[in-house]
Every structure is written in structure tokens, then in C-alpha cells.
Amino acid sequence: MPVKKGEMVRAIREKLENSVEAKASDTRFPAYLFETKGEVVDIKGDYALVMFGQVPTPNIWLRLDQIESF
């Protein structure tokens, strides 16, 4: 089922840690990506802009296959 704008999601650890994006930067991802709800605020192509509101952090672009409904 595709993710929609406004939906609550979280990152899938296995898919994010083994991604090309992870290999290009620091692979120590913060726990809130996997443990707290994030809201999809925009979708462009294969990527979703996710806002995690429980912690003061910037929004993050994640591939649609790297997130799941929470």
C-alpha cells in the first residue's frame, strides 16, 4: 500500500542502513527515525519528506521503500 501525504510513518532500519544514501554518509542513524512517528509532508517521485515532531530535528527525505506506516 503506497504511503500518502499526511500519513504517519517510521523508517525501516534494514532498508535504510543498507542503502546507497547510508553508504555515502554517517551510518549511525538516530533512534527516533525508527521508534517515533513521522508525518509525510511531501512526496516527490520515489522520495517522501518526513517531519519527526517529537524531537527538534530538520525534516528528512527518505525513499518510499525505506518507510512504513506507523
From Swiss-Prot:
The signal peptide, as residue positions, is: none
Q: Name the enzyme's class.
A: translocase
Keywords linked to the UniProt accession: Membrane, NAD, NADP, Plastoquinone, Quinone, Thylakoid, Translocase, Transport
Q: Where in the cell is it found?
A: Cellular thylakoid membrane
A Pfam family hit: NdhO
- How does the UniProt record describe the way this protein sits in the membrane? Peripheral membrane protein
Please give one Gene Ontology molecular function term for this protein.
oxidoreductase activity, acting on NAD(P)H, quinone or similar compound as acceptor
A single GO cellular-component term from the record reads: plasma membrane-derived thylakoid membrane
The answer on whether this UniProt entry bears the keyword Zinc-finger reads no
Name where it mostly resides: membrane
Query: What reaction is this protein's catalytic activity?
Result: a plastoquinone + NADH + (n+1) H(+)(in) = a plastoquinol + NAD(+) + n H(+)(out); a plastoquinone + NADPH + (n+1) H(+)(in) = a plastoquinol + NADP(+) + n H(+)(out)
Tell me its EC number(s), please. Answer: 7.1.1.-
- Which family does this protein fall into? Belongs to the complex I NdhO subunit family.
Biological role:
NDH-1 shuttles electrons from an unknown electron donor, via FMN and iron-sulfur (Fe-S) centers, to quinones in the respiratory and/or the photosynthetic chain. The immediate electron acceptor for the enzyme in this species is believed to be plastoquinone. Couples the redox reaction to proton translocation, and thus conserves the redox energy in a proton gradient. Cyanobacterial NDH-1 also plays a role in inorganic carbon-concentration.
**What HAMAP family does the database record attribute to this sequence?**
NDH1_NDH1O
Assembly = NDH-1 can be composed of about 15 different subunits; different subcomplexes with different compositions have been identified which probably have different functions.
- Under which name does UniProt file this protein? NAD(P)H-quinone oxidoreductase subunit O
Originating gene = ndhO
